[in-house]
Swiss-Prot record:
<dbReference type="InterPro" id="IPR023210">
    <property type="entry name" value="NADP_OxRdtase_dom"/>
</dbReference>
<dbReference type="InterPro" id="IPR020471">
    <property type="entry name" value="AKR"/>
</dbReference>
<feature type="site" description="Lowers pKa of active site Tyr">
    <location>
        <position position="88"/>
    </location>
</feature>
<feature type="active site" description="Proton donor">
    <location>
        <position position="58"/>
    </location>
</feature>
<keyword id="KW-0560">Oxidoreductase</keyword>
<comment type="function">
    <text>Oxidoreductase involved in the biosynthesis of akuammilan monoterpene indole alkaloids (MIAs) natural products, components with various biological properties such as antidiabetic, antibacterial, anti-inflammatory, anticancer, and antimalarial activities. Catalyzes the conversion of rhazimal to rhazimol.</text>
</comment>
<dbReference type="GO" id="GO:0035835">
    <property type="term" value="P:indole alkaloid biosynthetic process"/>
</dbReference>
<comment type="similarity">
    <text>Belongs to the aldo/keto reductase family.</text>
</comment>
<dbReference type="InterPro" id="IPR036812">
    <property type="entry name" value="NADP_OxRdtase_dom_sf"/>
</dbReference>
<feature type="binding site">
    <location>
        <begin position="215"/>
        <end position="220"/>
    </location>
    <ligand>
        <name>NADP(+)</name>
    </ligand>
</feature>
<feature type="binding site">
    <location>
        <position position="53"/>
    </location>
    <ligand>
        <name>NADP(+)</name>
    </ligand>
</feature>
<dbReference type="GO" id="GO:0016616">
    <property type="term" value="F:oxidoreductase activity, acting on the CH-OH group of donors, NAD or NADP as acceptor"/>
</dbReference>
<protein>
    <recommendedName>
        <fullName>Rhazimal reductase 1</fullName>
        <ecNumber>1.1.1.440</ecNumber>
    </recommendedName>
</protein>
<dbReference type="InterPro" id="IPR018170">
    <property type="entry name" value="Aldo/ket_reductase_CS"/>
</dbReference>
<comment type="pathway">
    <text>Alkaloid biosynthesis.</text>
</comment>
<dbReference type="Pfam" id="PF00248">
    <property type="entry name" value="Aldo_ket_red"/>
</dbReference>
<feature type="binding site">
    <location>
        <begin position="289"/>
        <end position="297"/>
    </location>
    <ligand>
        <name>NADP(+)</name>
    </ligand>
</feature>
Amino acid sequence: MEKQVQIPEIELNSGHKMPLVGFGTCVPDPIPPLEELAGIFLEAIKVGYRHFDTASSYGTEEALGRAVAQAIETGLVNGREEFFISSKLWCEDADLDLILPALKKTLGNMGLDYLDLSMIHMPVRVRKGAEMFNYTKEDLLPFDIQGTWKAMEECNKLGLAKSIGVSNYSCEKLTKLLENATVPPAVNQVEMNVVWQQRKLLPFCKEKNIHVTAWSPLLSYGAVWGSNAVMENPILVEIAASKNKTVAQVALRWIYEQGASFIMRTFNKDRMFENVQIFDWELTKEELDKIQKIPQRRGTLGEDFIHPEGPIKSVEDLWDGDL
């Protein structure tokens, strides 16, 4: 049997354990054919990944479900319980009456009885059937933070999601949610990397015992929509050279040292191994201080959800000024 990576776990506030590195399944259009995509995910399973992160908006739930089923059928893993599968409900389903049916649809897409973690993708609601990222004023609808969370709690109570969480929530939106929550979010999955270090949100979530997972830890370097701001950052390049590590390893180790987990996507088998070789070495205080001085800028502003006459009138409203 080929060598497998070993990834540590964290216990969430729900009592369930989650591997600290998730394999991301968001792929650029055109999405590869189902069997090809399932084969890539199966390769990641062979490498040792067990935490897989998807979303209804990615169009990859079925392929991931196929890979999980094949891994179980072929004896690559002992059973479903070896996996930690997370998915996110899109904005068109961010309504009290739509969340449960949407989660059931996700489970049907993947051929699963439950998710390990179900999240609300954005604190935003759009009209059902609206063209994604081409929203009109009429498509943008009021979002009920507390009502949608009650529906998530019902999914948890029914056993359809062992843990429930959110994505892209600010401190202020989490505070509003928690005012009326019976079950607190286990996870807040947010943009986090060395050029957007979440200096306000991270300590807030730690105080509330909500685990932070970083998406875009390398700013999607190499993708059409990506940026070189992390991978070509001169401070990281210098640290990587001095430690005989890759820039990606330094950037990912930094996230781990902040107490956060991260979602990584690569179809390159060598990088599947390389990206998790970060747990047996440390950054020095001097190196951490240098990273702390990197200028900060949020990469994703969410302008698609903004309209001067809509529920969210500015990016400042969406992120509650944390820009």
